[in-house]
Amino acid sequence: MKNQKHIILIPVYNDWNSLNQLLLEINSNLAQIKGFKNEILIVNDSSTKKIIIKKKKFDNIEKITLLNLRKNCGSQKAIAIGLSYLNTSYKNFFTTVMDGDGEDQPSEIVKMLTLANKFKDYVITSNRKKRKESIFVRLLYNIHLIFTFLLTYKWISFGNFTSFYSSNIKNILYDNQSCFAHSSSVIKNCKIIRIYAKRGKRYFDNSNLNLLDLIEHSLRINTLFLKRIILTTIIYFIFILIFFNKFLFIKTIYIFLSFFLYILIYLIRKKHLIENLSRYNKYQIKLI
């Protein structure tokens, strides 16, 4: 039986030390699975630091391709551009999308790819069952999960770490909404199978995300569900009218917060929506 193509897509911005460590661990873990020709697609998000990819002989990785974006656009758009490139350049393949900092553990790839091969109509998502951040960060994350669920009725406890057959890419890229958040586009447009894994430890340095970045990312995840959010907020308002009609203050605050949320989501959409992925960010292709 002919080996099937499997391409691991990794967005990178400046963190080349982590990428090199990740490639070593990916190569080691891929030895556990047979029947696949494994390749790596690195989407360089216009890094300002010198590109350093150590050319080692990888027994289980046949090719490494570097996609150099002309301008920095963030990991979510970088993933969308990478998927768009794969969709137009290859046919009948498997893809694993993962971050390059070590938090997505390479040891999970074999399990995810095996499931993706068995269930080709599904996207396999790696959900975090235990987080190692501070209590404050975990609290914020849980607030985000609950907030998103109450607005969208979707429990989005996974990030970029996903595996799937190539036929799912057209759904993920539907209406170019994956540029907001890969996870939201997956759960909105695809059937998913959840697996659960511990979050890995970053190889080097700490995350540069601050509180405002986390809030914006939470809003980006919700942006794909704007129509549903409008509907759910109306339903909640009807509930308030029935049970709290005498409390003008509650109604006023709720209306204000609802419209404030609509405005924030509108601004996020305006900032991040890409009308045409193929024309948005020109790139240079380089084989390592």
Where do the protein language model's features map onto the residues?
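Donor nucleotide-sugar binding loop of glycosyltransferases
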Residues: 15-19, 47, 105
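Cell-envelope/extracellular polymer assembly enzymes that use nucleotide-activated donors
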Residues: 5-7, 39
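Catalytic donor/gating beta->alpha subdomain of glycosyltransferases that bind UDP-sugars
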Residues: 170-229
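Acceptor/aglycone-binding surface of glycosyltransferases and processive sugar-polymer synthases
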Residues: 70-71, 76-85, 94-97, 103-179, ...
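A conserved acidic beta->alpha catalytic loop
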Residues: 44-53, 102-103
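Membrane-embedded multi-pass helical conduit in multi-pass membrane proteins
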Residues: 230-288
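Short beta-strand/loop segment that forms part of the nucleotide-sugar
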Residues: 35-47, 67-68
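Short, well-formed alpha-helical segments that are part of the catalytic scaffolds
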Residues: 15-31
